[in-house]
Design a protein with these regions (language model features):
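Bulky hydrophobic segments
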Residues: 1-116, 122-123, 129, 133-151
Length: 151
């Protein structure tokens, strides 16, 4: 019994830590988020030995778009095991995970209305939700492939 409780706490701790990191990143001012994206863009250009004059903006823009998808895909992947351990219902946990991710996907964009220099973006909201769908789909595939969470 104690081991099950520990697994539940650890699963939810992972979700909470990820949510705090996401909240921190989405609450940054525009200058700060641009600086972080620029640093990552330079790192990627150097890693792939791409010329900055040609590739800077495509990589910068692609990175910012991919970040929306990746952040919420990871959240969905973290949420499912926490929910399945808590509810002990794997099938409903997919829906709960997708629903919770969807609410957070919309809420993170709406929260930007309160941050100076940031704006709420419907395309970003849709990218966030796409990440939720992809993450949930990935958990379905992983569960089928490795029989994780089957009882």
């Amino acid at each position: 019994m104690k081991q099950r409780h520990l697994k539940i706490w650890l699963a939810w701790a992972g979700v909470l830590i990820w949510c705090v990191l996401c909240l921190y990143l989405s609450s940054q001012r525009l200058a700060d988020t641009t600086r972080l994206s620029a640093a990552l863009t330079h790192w990627i250009l150097g890693l792939l030995s791409l010329p900055g004059q040609t590739w800077y903006m495509p990589v910068f823009d692609g990175l910012r778009l991919a970040a929306h998808i990746l952040v919420f895909a990871i959240l969905a992947v973290l949420l499912w095991p926490a929910l399945v351990l808590t509810t002990q219902n794997a099938h409903k946990s997919y829906l709960y995970s997708l629903g919770a991710c969807g609410v957070l996907a919309v809420g993170s964009e709406l929260g930007k209305l309160l941050i100076p220099g940031r704006h709420c973006s419907l395309p970003d909201m849709l990218l966030n939700f796409l990440g939720c769908l992809l993450g949930t789909g990935l958990t379905v595939l992983l569960r089928r492939r490795f029989a994780v969470g089957k009882r």
